[in-house]
């Protein structure tokens, strides 16, 4: 199965940091955000990754490309560990492809841009703003990996969800399921989706996390999706049409997620991952403990 990762967005929520740097290249500890996303996909067994990109995002392509000059320098200076880290950014059996989204016409349009590469077959979509903590769930067997497994067993499209505080439902796409009592790793049939409902009208507190596995049926629906909110082609509109044609399931996320397209979420992720850094984690813990004394 291939995965589409839309990276054409301008990252306005993270300005001024993203004025000259793609938001996906902002670092968490010592890796850019997009590296965590690719690692998740690879751990889930995906071998073909399609970036839907923009002319300002060359740094992403460069990050995953071979840097002969850098590798030669590290080899000459006998920095073997760093050389191995650079060379292992993308496993040899994983193929990365890049497709341009010429105009910013929304997430639905971005996904549709990947059709020529993916072909008329099932595929996954992973939004790069959201990192799933690999220290709270096993990416080889849970979350995206489990969604792909569930799809292969049932042929039902999967949408990852997680509970959010009731007062925050208006910030998210919310799913209406036959039951609200699904636990981590479980699924439930979706009756409908509501984009950023009011607190009073929210059918549940299960918010879409940014991981999808779609049947090939979604392609024709995306092509027929009219321009919606913000003069954009909305992925949620296509999913609503998909729900009318076939079973679509909500898959309950396991563990924690960080919204790194939001400044506070990004800061939280940075601290959490830095505390667990293999080399610097213990020293960083001491720094945080000292800082905490003055709060």
From Swiss-Prot:
Signal peptide: none annotated. Keywords: Nucleotidyltransferase, Transferase. It comes from the Bacteria. The keyword Transferase applies. SUPFAM superfamilies: Nucleotide-diphospho-sugar transferases (SSF53448). Coiled coil: none annotated. Transmembrane segments: none annotated. Its EC number is 2.7.7.9. One of its GO terms (biological process) is UDP-alpha-D-glucose metabolic process. It catalyses: alpha-D-glucose 1-phosphate + UTP + H(+) = UDP-alpha-D-glucose + diphosphate. It holds the Pfam family NTP_transferase. GO terms for molecular function: UTP:glucose-1-phosphate uridylyltransferase activity. It is an enzyme of class 2 (transferase). The keyword Disulfide bond does not apply. Belongs to the UDPGP type 2 family. PANTHER family: UTP--GLUCOSE-1-PHOSPHATE URIDYLYLTRANSFERASE (PTHR43197:SF1). May play a role in stationary phase survival. This is UTP--glucose-1-phosphate uridylyltransferase.
């Amino acid at each position: 199965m291939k995965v589409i990762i839309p990276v054409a967005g301008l990252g306005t929520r993270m300005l001024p940091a993203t004025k000259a740097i793609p938001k996906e290249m902002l670092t968490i500890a010592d890796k850019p955000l997009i590296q965590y996303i690719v690692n998740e996909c690879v751990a889930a067994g995906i071998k073909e990754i399609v970036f839907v990109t923009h002319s300002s995002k060359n740094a992403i392509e460069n990050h995953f490309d071979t840097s002969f000059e850098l590798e030669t320098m590290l080899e000459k200076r006998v920095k073997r560990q760093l050389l191995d880290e650079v060379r292992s950014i993308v496993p040899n059996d994983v193929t990365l492809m890049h497709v341009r989204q010429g105009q910013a016409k929304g997430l639905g349009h971005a996904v549709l841009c990947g059709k020529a590469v993916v072909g008329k077959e099932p595929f996954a979509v992973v939004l790069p703003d959201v990192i799933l903590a690999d220290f709270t769930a096993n990416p080889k067997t849970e979350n995206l990996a489990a969604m792909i497994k569930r799809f292969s067993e049932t042929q039902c499209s999967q949408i990852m969800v997680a509970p959010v505080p009731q007062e925050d439902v208006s910030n998210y796409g919310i799913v209406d399921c036959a039951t609200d009592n699904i636990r981590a790793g479980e699924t439930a049939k979706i009756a409908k989706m509501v984009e950023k409902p009011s607190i009073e009208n929210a059918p549940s507190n299960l918010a879409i996390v940014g991981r999808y596995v779609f049947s090939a049926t979604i392609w024709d629906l995306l092509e027929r999706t009219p321009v919606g909110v913000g003069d954009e082609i909305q992925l949620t509109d296509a999913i609503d049409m998909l729900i009318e044609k076939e079973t679509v399931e909500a898959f309950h996320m396991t563990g924690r997620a960080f919204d790194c397209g939001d400044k506070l979420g990004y800061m939280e992720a940075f601290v959490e991952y830095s505390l667990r850094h293999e080399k610097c984690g213990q020293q960083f813990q001491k720094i945080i403990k000292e800082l905490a004394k003055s709060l």
